[in-house]
Design a protein with these regions (language model features):
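A short, Lys/Arg-rich alpha-helix, primarily the initiator
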Residues: 1-13, 97-98
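The alpha-helix within a helix-turn-helix
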Residues: 11, 22, 51
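Short alpha-helical DNA-recognition segment
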Residues: 15-34
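Phosphate-coordinating loops and pocket residues in cytosolic domains that bind phosphorylated ligands
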Residues: 34, 52, 64-65
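Short, conserved catalytic or interaction motifs in soluble domains
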Residues: 37
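A secondary-structure capping/hinge motif
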Residues: 40-41
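DNA major-groove recognition helix of helix-turn-helix/homeodomain DNA-binding modules
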Residues: 45-61
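Short, charged recognition helix plus adjacent turn
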Residues: 60-98
Length: 98
């Protein structure tokens, strides 16, 4: 999962609109949409702002390292997938008999 997808998954897991999410972390709506659509990537300053907020700290290790530490309160967002990989067939690996 890439950075834009991770941002979107975090926001949706928290049940927030783009405007609400942007307001909470103190960035503009247009900046957030540019991150979610992959036009820009958040820099270090924005990433620090995001994970300094208590509501989003639990996603830090997942977001940065694709890891989690439940004992430290780290979790993976509830929405593990946003859409299915278009290159993957739901029948991949099945025996079709042909």
């Amino acid at each position: 999962m890439d950075i834009p997808q991770k941002i979107r998954v975090m926001r949706k897991s928290e049940g927030l609109t783009q405007r609400e999410f942007a307001d909470i972390i103190g960035i503009s709506y247009s900046a957030l949409t540019s991150y979610e659509y992959g036009r820009n990537l958040p820099g270090l300053e924005i990433t620090i702002k995001l994970f300094k907020h208590p509501r989003f700290r639990k996603y830090r290790d997942w977001f940065l390292f694709d890891e989690m530490e439940p004992k430290a309160g780290q979790v993976i967002p509830a929405l593990a997938r946003v859409g299915q990989d278009e290159t993957e067939s739901p029948h991949y690996g099945s025996n079709s008999g042909e």
